């Protein structure tokens, strides 16, 4: 397979964008670790070990010592596929680095490698001159131009570790060289408890029970329930943001206001909208179960609809309850919905009326930001799929200056395994996937 995300994985030169994508989804320091141990939730949160959460994937990881990283798996097999494909990628890239710098089996290395090692071992922020010298040597090692490396250099860094790019390249290469010269193999293990618990819905059950208990405490269990899978700000903003911020953003469109709220420094306006929502029946449930899925519950009876974006909303006799859940991860979507719809304490059935899923997906027809309406599903092979009829149709979304496509949807086991040729086949063959 040549997964699309990983770019030039099959070429001799090191793939930079793919490496950035993967490094952002793995814990900081993993490039230094020879032993990766996948565990379930086994009590590390109660220890002196500090949780190390990757910037782009919410999963707890713990650096046990200089050689070992533990990664906590709470989201089922999709999480394991995700991690294994990312680790496979960095291992492949590390061997490319090794092949370019190792001159013989005795461990003699190239001049460029020695210079990179000196730069990394300084353990201080490099001056502009030192940085550019190190980039020049690294460009030779990676088979890339000076400019290509300069362009991506800062994306790897942070305020505390601006030169992390060099550090990542050095340690990937170093471990691959030691594998070759000293036969110190990198090892991925699964803890016995993780093997035992996989597929048992442990975290999903705790998560769902917690939601049902909050519904019961607030006398909402018997009301009609609509489940919405979306970002935590989406539903809250669509109901409360525009009226709340109309005076601040005079004569601006609704979409302008939503964009302002999404900006990274917009905490003040976001807090304002959230404060209004909390006063009008929103209950916020940050996750404590290990699923990493936060939840908001909206009691529509407590909302003053005249002061919302939907002043003409007609709610009927029994005012419904909205349960907004953050995006699930792969197989976890089945686990959480399966557990949520189980009766509370065996005798109280939930009055579930609808599930709405706002999701991101790769589009085969059209472009980024277009709307896709799946009308059939081609599944990637595990039995854990929850089937339902899609009541949305393309014509409901026409006329908003956004392109809309309807057709079959292909699901793949882990984002990281999307392959252009395979997807092209599904798009162009009789499957006609979008």
Tell where the protein language model's regions lie, with residue ranges.
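Short, basic and Ser/Thr-rich N-terminal targeting/leader segments
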Residues: 221-223, 351
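Short, hydrophobic/proline-enriched secondary-structure or compact coil segments at domain edges
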Residues: 223-231, 321-328
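Glycine-rich phosphate- or other oxyanion-binding loops that anchor nucleotides, phosphorylated ligands
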Residues: 1-139, 197-205, 294-434
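N-terminal glycine-/serine-/threonine-rich phosphate-binding loop
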Residues: 175-221, 330-333, 343
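Ser/Thr-centered flexible coil motifs
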Residues: 127, 142-145, 160
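Long non-globular sequence segments
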Residues: 148-164, 171, 177-184, 189
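Adenosine ribonucleotide-centric catalytic and binding domains
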Residues: 224-226, 230-293, 371-384
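Short N-terminal helix-initiation segments at or just after the protein's N-terminus
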Residues: 157-173, 262-263, 289-304
């Amino acid at each position: 397979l040549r997964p699309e995300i990983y770019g030039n994985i099959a070429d001799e030169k090191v793939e930079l964008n793919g490496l950035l994508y993967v490094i952002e989804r793995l814990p900081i320091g993993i490039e230094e670790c020879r032993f990766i141990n996948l565990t379930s939730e086994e009590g590390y949160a109660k220890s002196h070990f500090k949780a190390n959460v990757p910037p782009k994937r919410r999963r707890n990881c713990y650096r046990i010592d200089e050689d070992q990283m533990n990664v906590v798996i709470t989201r089922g097999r999709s999480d394991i596929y995700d991690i294994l494909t990312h680790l496979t990628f960095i291992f492949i890239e590390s061997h490319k680095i090794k092949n370019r710098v190792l001159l013989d089996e005795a461990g003699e290395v190239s001049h460029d490698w020695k210079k990179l090692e000196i730069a990394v071992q300084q353990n201080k922020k490099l001056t502009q001159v030192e940085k550019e010298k190190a980039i020049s040597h690294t460009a030779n090692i990676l088979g890339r131009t000076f400019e290509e490396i300069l362009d991506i250099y800062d994306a790897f860094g942070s305020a505390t570790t601006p030169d992390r790019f060099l550090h990542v390249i050095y340690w990937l290469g170093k471990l691959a060289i030691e594998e070759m010269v000293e036969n110190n193999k990198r090892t991925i293990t699964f803890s016995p408890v993780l093997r035992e618990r996989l597929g048992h819905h442990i975290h999903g059950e705790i998560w769902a029970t917690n939601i049902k208990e909050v519904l019961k405490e607030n006398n909402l269990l018997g009301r009609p329930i609509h489940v919405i899978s979306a970002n935590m700000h989406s539903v809250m903003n669509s109901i409360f943001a525009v009226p709340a911020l109309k005076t601040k953003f005079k004569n601006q469109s609704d979409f302008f206001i939503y964009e302002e709220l999404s900006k990274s420094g917009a905490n003040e306006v976001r807090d304002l909208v959230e404060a209004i929502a909390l006063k009008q029946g929103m209950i916020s449930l940050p996750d404590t179960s290990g699923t990493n899925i936060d939840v908001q519950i909206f009691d529509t009876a407590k909302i003053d609809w005249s002061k919302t974006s939907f002043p003409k909303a007609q709610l009927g006799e029994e005012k419904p309850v909205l349960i907004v859940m953050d995006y699930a991860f792969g197989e976890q979507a089945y686990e959480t919905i399966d557990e949520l719809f189980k009766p509370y304490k065996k005798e109280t059935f939930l009055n579930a009326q609808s599930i709405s899923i706002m999701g991101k997906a790769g589009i085969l027809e059209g472009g980024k930001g277009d709307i896709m309406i799946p009308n059939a599903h081609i599944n990637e092979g595990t039995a854990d799929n929850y089937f339902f009829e899609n009541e949305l149709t393309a014509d409901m979304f026409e006329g908003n200056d956004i392109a809309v496509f309807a057709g079959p949807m292909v699901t793949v086991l882990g984002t990281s395994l999307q392959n252009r040729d395979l997807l092209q086949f599904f798009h162009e063959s009789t499957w006609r996937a979008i």
